[in-house]
């Protein structure tokens, strides 16, 4: 684009730098490294966290740089009690820049006090299942500066153990944390993703996933930028 060349990698590959910049040029590249999102939990599960989002500038020299593109995490298995959590998304890397996969969404587990969301680039959503509050998974794990993501949403217990309605919480996104979900009502939205214009136009990446629901509760939708 203009004096710039855009390289986009949707799968793992090698970025080959053949020559350094001229005396009047630059040896710096702008990068955006996005990890895979976390899988949602099974059996009225919490939303998966958005994949880690890291952007900045990096000096390069004439050599090959390995690119790893992390895939999305697997969903938790439903139709059973306890429901299984999803799995963490895959890590994406460029040179020494690493973005962590999104945290797993919690699975619903009747008879267990609470199921917390998993940690990751952004954290997964939790599910409260009795008189205890579930926590969202920690975002920006491992810690980076600037932060690669935000926490997942927690879930507050507002019903008797094991009774409907039940609603799970949402995953965090690169642009905003997942907000806590009222277990009896649901109807929340996953954490918003973060925008980047590195591809020439503005796109949003790494939104948090929505949470499931049962009975009269309303399932939560995913956040902008990829949350499902």
Where do the language-model regions lie?
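Glycine-biased low-complexity/repetitive sequence motifs
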Residues: 1-228
